[in-house]
Amino acid sequence: MKQYLQVTKPGIIFGNLISVIGGFLLASKGSLDVPLFILTMAGVSLVVASGCVFNNYIDRDIDCIMERTKNRALVRGLIAPGVSLWYASALGVAGIALLYWAANPLAALLAVLGFIVYVGVYSLYMKRHSVYGTLVGSLSGAAPPVIGYCAVSGQFDSGALILLAIFSLWQMPHSYAIAIFRFKDYQAANIPVLPVVKGIVVAKHHITLYILAFMVPTLMLFLGGYAGYKYLIVATAVSVWWLGMALSGYKQAVDDSLWARKLFMFSIVTITCLSVMMSVDFQPDATPVLVSMLP
């Protein structure tokens, strides 16, 4: 049974659940519906697990080439490919049905869209054929917090849009950092990620620009009246520090692999801090800060 758990990538599920909690509690505004919270977490977990199993099935030919993925269950033959398809399908159907039944049709629809983008667009085509694969994949990576938010709100409003922007833009430097310190793996598997296709220097430029872009919706969550001043202080601190780490990559004597690994690790710190702060420093009434300042 261990291999059936591993193929769902528990680490990725856990990381996504942190963002789901952030979106859910932000929308809850202090009024927590515990059954809805638990069922939303379960539904998203099942859908993410399904996507990961499908990804393992699709990528088994390149996973055997890459050092970090060569011991995955499907590569080692611990799970038959056909069985993995049935397993992934069952997980996905269960997760989407649970979100539809326990939350609302919008949450289920967002899960379906995120799943289609990740499995159908990113994994099946973009990852192997386009340097823009990471950009497309970032949209699916941003789905969980938006699902958590919409499970409570029942609508895709400006708060949901801001969350989508925050988590999509965060994915880019996070993913490019991985591609830099795993450069040889991606190169050997012929995966056209930006650092391999355009070079590490160009990737550094993109990382810096995406972090700057990421800071805008991060600020908008405060200016839009969704989060408070404590959120603003923490979000600003981690974002500026992350940007500083990115800029340190331009030093001549820098070890690109070590720099990228540190940048990757801090990207996790950054998004975790944001998720925690939006969970605890929400605004009961989302009144835009700029509007509230008017006489």
Swiss-Prot record:
Name of a matching Pfam family: UbiA
Subcellular location: Cell inner membrane
Gene3D superfamilies the record matches: UbiA prenyltransferase (1.10.357.140)
Principal EC category: transferase
Cited InterPro entries: Protohaem_IX_farnesylTrfase (IPR006369), UbiA_prenyltransferase (IPR000537), UbiA_prenylTrfase_CS (IPR030470), UbiA_sf (IPR044878)
Gene Ontology CC: one annotated term: plasma membrane
Record's keyword terms, sorted: Cell inner membrane, Cell membrane, Heme biosynthesis, Membrane, Transferase, Transmembrane, Transmembrane helix
Annotated GO biological process: heme O biosynthetic process
Recorded metabolic or biological pathway in which this protein acts: Porphyrin-containing compound metabolism; heme O biosynthesis; heme O from protoheme: step 1/1
Function summary: Converts heme B (protoheme IX) to heme O by substitution of the vinyl group on carbon 2 of heme B porphyrin ring with a hydroxyethyl farnesyl side group.
Something else known: Carbon 2 of the heme B porphyrin ring is defined according to the Fischer nomenclature.
Name of the protein: Protoheme IX farnesyltransferase
Source organism of this protein record: Aeromonas salmonicida (strain A449)
Lineage: Bacteria, Pseudomonadati, Pseudomonadota, Gammaproteobacteria, Aeromonadales
